[in-house]
C-alpha cells in the first residue's frame, strides 16, 4: 500500500498561471533560464542564480538564500497563494493531440525508503544534495516528481468526472504543449482517492529520482529532529504528480560518440557485422522500427543495425534493453566506452530533439557517429523496478515534462 494525502496547494491565481509556470530546473541551463524568465516566472525560484549579474554559481549559499527570498516575495506579491482547503488536483498535459491526466498529491517519504515507491535509476550524490538543500531551505517541494501507478478504473472515473467541468487553468506553453488543472476539494472524493491508493501496491518513479531522494532525506531529517514525531506531520509528505501507467509514453534517448576508437570507418562497419545485420539506408533519416533494431548515422549516411539472435538475453530484464545491447556490443566492445557516467567521449540526446539533431552533431564535426534507439516501454520500466534492478544511465526520456509552479507543496 502507499500513503497519500490531499494538501493545501500553493499556486498562482488563474491570471498568472501561464507566466508563473515554467520548465523544470534540469532541462535548461542558467543562460537559457535567464533569457526565458519573465517577471513572475518560477525560474527565479528554481534557478535563482539568474538574478545575479554575472550569473552566480548555482550551488553557492547566496543563490540558495535568493531562492528563499524569491519564494517569499512571490507569495507577498500574490503571485502564489495557498488554497484554504486540502485538495487533490488533476493536471492534464497535451502533446501532439494526445492528453495524459495525472493526480497531484502528496506521498509519504517512508514509502520511498521502504520500497513501496519504486525507483529504476541510481542518483548522483551531488545532485541529490543540491535538491535537498533547496527543499530544506524552502520548507517546500517547489517542483513535483513524476510517478506512475497501475491503472485503476475507479480513479479513472473520478478523473473523468472532474475534467468534465471547466478547468481552473488552461494554457499553452511556448513549446506548444497544453496544460490544464482542475481542483478536487470535495471531502468525500478526496477521502475516496486516499482509500483507493491505500490498496495500490506500489508507485513507480518515472522522472525525478533526485527530487524524490532529496525529499525523503529531508523527511528523515525532520523526523530525527522531532522527538514528538507521529508520522503525520506535513514534512513527511512530498509533492508528486501520478499518472496511470497506460497513459505514459517513453521516447527515445539517443547517443552520439566523438570518435571510432582508432578504427577506420571500414574497420568499424566490419566489426559491427559480428553482432548485427548492417543495412545501408542512405541519406534519408532512418528511425528504429522495433526492439533490437538501431539507427546509426556515420559519414553522411544512415544505417539500420539489427542485433543478431543470441547476442542478448530476452529473459534478463536488463540484458534485453536496447541501451544494454548497444552498450555491450558497440560502445564497450568496439568503441571502448565502458562507463557511460564518466566517459567524455559520449553524449546523450533526448528524442524530443528529433533524429535531425543526431545528424547535425555528426555533420558539424563535433561527433563522429550517432545511434538512435527504439524507446523503452513502460512495462519494461515496471518489470525492472519490481525486480529491484536499476536501468543503465540515460535510458528513459519522458515527454511532456511536468510544468513547475502549477502547484507547490509547503510544509512550513
Annotate each language-model stretch with its function.
Residues 1-412:
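Surface-exposed, charge/polar-rich loops and edge strands
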Amino acid at each position: 500500500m502507499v500513503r497519500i494525502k490531499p494538501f493545501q496547494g500553493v499556486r498562482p491565481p488563474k491570471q498568472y498561471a501561464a507566466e508563473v509556470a515554467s520548465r523544470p530546473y534540469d532541462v535548461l541551463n542558467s543562460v537559457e533560464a535567464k533569457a526565458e524568465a519573465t517577471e513572475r516566472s518560477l525560474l527565479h525560484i528554481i534557478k535563482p542564480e539568474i538574478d545575479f549579474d554575472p550569473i552566480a554559481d548555482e550551488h553557492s549559499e547566496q543563490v540558495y538564500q535568493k531562492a528563499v527570498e524569491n519564494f517569499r516575495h512571490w507569495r507577498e506579491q500574490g503571485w502564489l497563494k495557498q488554497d484554504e482547503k486540502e485538495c487533490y488536483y488533476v493536471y492534464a498535459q497535451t502533446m501532439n493531440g494526445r492528453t495524459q491526466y495525472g493526480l497531484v498529491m502528496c506521498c509519504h517519504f517512508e514509502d520511498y525508503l521502504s520500497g513501496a515507491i519504486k525507483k529504476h535509476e541510481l542518483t548522483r550524490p551531488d545532485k541529490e544534495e543540491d535538491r535537498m538543500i533547496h527543499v530544506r531551505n524552502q520548507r517546500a517541494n517547489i517542483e513535483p516528481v513524476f510517478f506512475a501507478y497501475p491503472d485503476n478504473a475507479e480513479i479513472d472515473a473520478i478523473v473523468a468526472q472532474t475534467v468534465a467541468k471547466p478547468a481552473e487553468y488552461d494554457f499553452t506553453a511556448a513549446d506548444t504543449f497544453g496544460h490544464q488543472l482542475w481542483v478536487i476539494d470535495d471531502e468525500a472524493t478526496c477521502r475516496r482517492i486516499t482509500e483507493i491508493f491505500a490498496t495500490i501496491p506500489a508507485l513507480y518513479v518515472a522522472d525525478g529520482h533526485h527530487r524524490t531522494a532529496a525529499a525523503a532525506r529531508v523527511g528523515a531529517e525532520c523526523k530525527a529532529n522531532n522527538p514528538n514525531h507521529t508520522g503525520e506531520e506535513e514534512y513527511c509528505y512530498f509533492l508528486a504528480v501520478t499518472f496511470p501507467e497506460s497513459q505514459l509514453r517513453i521516447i527515445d534517448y539517443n547517443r552520439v560518440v566523438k570518435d571510432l576508437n582508432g578504427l577506420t570507418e571500414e574497420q568499424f562497419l566490419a566489426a559491427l557485422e559480428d553482432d548485427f545485420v548492417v543495412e545501408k539506408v542512405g541519406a534519408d533519416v532512418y528511425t528504429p522500427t522495433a526492439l533490437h533494431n538501431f539507427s546509426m548515422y556515420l559519414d553522411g549516411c544512415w544505417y539500420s543495425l539489427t542485433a543478431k539472435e543470441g547476442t542478448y538475453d530476452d529473459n534478463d530484464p536488463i540484458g534485453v534493453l536496447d541501451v544494454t545491447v548497444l552498450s555491450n556490443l558497440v560502445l564497450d566492445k568496439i568503441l571502448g566506452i565502458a562507463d557511460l557516467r564518466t566517459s567524455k567521449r559520449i553524449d546523450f540526446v533526448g528524442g524530443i530533439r528529433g533524429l535531425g539533431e543526431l545528424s547535425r552533431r555528426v555533420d558539424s564535426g563535433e561527433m563522429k557517429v550517432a545511434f538512435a534507439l527504439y524507446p523503452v516501454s513502460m512495462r519494461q520500466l515496471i518489470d525492472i523496478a519490481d525486480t529491484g534492478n536499476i536501468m543503465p544511465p540515460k535510458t528513459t526520456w519522458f515527454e511532456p515534462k511536468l510544468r513547475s509552479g502549477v502547484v507547490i507543496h509547503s510544509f512550513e
